[in-house]
Amino acid sequence: MNASLSDFTILEADAAELQQQLTHGNVTAREMAALTLAKIERDNPTLHAFTHVFADQALASATDSDLRRSRDALRGPLDGVPLAVKANLAVAGWPQHAGLAFRREAVVSDDAFVIGKLRAAGAVLLGLTNMDAGALGATGRNAAFGDVTNPRAPGVTTGGSSAGSAAALAAKLTTLAIGTDTIGSVRIPAAYCGIAALKPTSGAISTRGVIATHQRFDHVGPMARSMRDLATLFKVLVGWDRQCRVSFPLTFQPLRPATTPSRVGFVTGFDTLEPDSATLDGYNRAIAALR
C-alpha cells in the first residue's frame, strides 16, 4: 500500500473513492480486505456487528479482483469492494440464521439472487451481519448473537432490524452493506447510526433467497456511507428475477441534476407526541438549515 495512504483513510473511503485508490495503485483489493478484516477482528467483539466472518473467502475473492484488474478485466464499480450481508439472506456455505438461535446451524447450499449478482459484480463478501431476531424488531438487541452497539453513541440503540449492517458501516468495518426492510429495517438503523440506506420500489430487487417476514412488503435494501454508493449498489442489485413472484422488470434511471428547486415538507405541530427538548431543538435546527 502507498505509504502516504493511512489505514484509517482508506477504511473511511466510500466505494467510489476506494475504486480511485485501487485504480491508481495506492492499495490493492487484498490489502483493503486484510485491513478491513483486521478491524473487524479488533472491534467486532464489542460491537457485535458481525455474527460470521468469511475471512479466507474474502481474501481469496480480493486476490481474484486484483488479478482481474491486472488483466484489465474488471467487472464494474463494485469489483474488489468489501461488502457485508444481513444474516437473513442466503449465502452458500453459511448459516442463514436471521438472528434466530434455532437457525445457528442452518447452512444453505445456494445463494440468494442478489448475492449471485454481487459475486458476479466482483464484490468482496466479508460476512453475515447481526440483526433483530427474525427481523422482528428495531433495537438491534439479540439474545443469541449479542446486542449490536451503536458506534456513534455506545449505549444508544442502533435501530433495526438491519442493525449489524448499519453499525458495521458506521464503524468502518465494511465499505458497503446489504439489509432488508419491511417496515423500516434499513431506514431506522441508517438514521440512528448516521449512514445512508434505501428501501427501493417494491419488486425492483428480487427477494428470492431472503427469509420472508411479509412477502409482499419485504425489500432488499442497499446500505452505504454515501448517496453515490447507494445509487451504484442499487444499480447492481436491481433487475427482474423470473423466479421471484414480486419481481418485475425495471429500467435503472441514473441520477441527474434537478431541473427545479427542491421542496421539503415538515410538521409544525406534535399534538399527539411529546418529543424531548433536545430532539425538538435538533429538528428545528435541521429545518432552519434547509431553508
What are these regions (language model features)?
Residues 199-281, 285-286:
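A short helix-breaking turn/cap at a secondary-structure junction
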Residues 36, 58, 86, 118, ...:
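Conserved hydrophobic/aromatic pocket- or pore-lining residues that grip, position, or stack substrates
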Residues 1-57, 291:
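An N-terminal boundary/leader segment
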Residues 65-82, 229, 256-265:
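Immediate post-signal peptide segment of exported/extracytoplasmic ligand-binding proteins
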Residues 77-114:
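Enzymes and membrane/adaptor proteins characterized by extended Gly/Ser/Thr/Asp/Glu-rich
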Residues 56-63, 122-123, 132:
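Long amphipathic alpha-helix in the N-terminal Rossmann-like dinucleotide-binding domain
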Residues 29-33, 63, 277-291:
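Acyltransferase
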Residues 110-237:
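Short glycine/serine-rich loop segments
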